[in-house]
């Protein structure tokens, strides 16, 4: 069964710019760019050039990579920090554009750049204003916060093309599609990553997609179908980003992903990512909910989740 990090790379290979930016950002955060450059033959030199030029006067101290004692930096840490910040800002911009283009994702509350005020050093989140710990945003136009600069657009287009055309990545992702799925029934076990969508009362949460209503197993089957179409049809690759971080993704299992907050806001209350109802309900379950879930997937008796 796929996990959300599988889906992230599947989305990057499918040409989703937000997935590409996120995959690079995570690699830079943990100083693990070898997996991208050596593993998949994807050059990050365009990002190096961009970051050195655009962020030359910004120390990007908040974006210094995590120290890996087992693997010392083979690239200057300050350069990695500049690359890290550069791709993070691009990620936030392209994500907000996806949200704007897909109102059905119900993620308007995650369009944080719209309320960004570098001059005042603040950002508004869910009706509350917070101070920023970093106000250097050389590529953000106060009148059009989510607009990519021409250089950013060229950079993310170049990087996305190299991800989509990497033969090694294509080989790995096609293996994931061939052998993986949203869930699997195996030897009286129901296997899935993260959760099922449930309401607070334990009922299956219904999700409307293209005029039809899905829940439980039918929703997992629909997500599986859409994930395959996103890659093999070359259309709607952004759905794979939905599966990476949306509150209605069974692969994510949280109400929001607070990446922006963790970088730019010191108040740790904003860093919290509340879990979906599934987890609390399963902790309190006397076996009734588990039995109902197993029945939904055609399993019973001594079957396990």
Q: In which residue ranges do the predicted regions lie?
A:
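Feature recognizes metal-dependent phosphohydrolase scaffolds
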Residues: 1-305
């Amino acid at each position: 069964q796929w996990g959300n990090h599988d889906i992230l790379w599947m989305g990057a290979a499918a040409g989703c710019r937000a997935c590409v930016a996120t995959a690079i950002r995570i690699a830079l955060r943990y100083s693990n760019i070898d997996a991208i450059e050596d593993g998949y033959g994807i050059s990050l030199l365009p990002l190096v050039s961009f970051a050195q030029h655009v962020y030359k006067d910004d120390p990007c101290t908040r974006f210094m990579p995590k120290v890996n004692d087992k693997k010392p930096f083979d690239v200057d840490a300050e350069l990695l920090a500049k690359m890290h910040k550069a791709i993070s800002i691009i990620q936030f911009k392209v994500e907000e554009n996806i949200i704007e283009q897909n109102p059905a994702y119900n993620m308007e509350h995650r369009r944080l750049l719209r309320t960004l005020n570098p001059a005042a050093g603040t950002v508004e989140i869910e009706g509350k204003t917070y101070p920023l710990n970093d106000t250097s945003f050389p590529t953000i136009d106060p009148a059009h916060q989510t607009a990519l600069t021409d250089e950013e657009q060229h950079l993310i287009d170049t990087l996305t093309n190299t991800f989509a055309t990497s033969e090694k990545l294509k080989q790995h992702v096609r293996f994931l599609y061939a052998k993986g799925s949203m869930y699997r029934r195996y030897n009286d076990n129901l296997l899935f990553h993260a959760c099922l969508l449930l309401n607070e009362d334990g009922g299956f949460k219904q999700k409307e997609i293209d005029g039809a209503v899905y829940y439980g197993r039918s929703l997992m089957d629909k997500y599986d179908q859409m994930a395959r179409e996103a890659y093999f049809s070359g259309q709607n690759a952004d759905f794979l980003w939905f599966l990476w971080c949306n509150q209605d993704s069974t692969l994510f299992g949280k109400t929001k992903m607070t990446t922006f907050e963790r970088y730019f806001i010191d108040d740790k209350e904003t860093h919290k990512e509340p879990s979906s109802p599934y987890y609390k309900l399963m902790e309190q379950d006397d076996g009734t909910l588990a039995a109902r879930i197993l029945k939904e997937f055609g399993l019973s008796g001594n079957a396990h989740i």
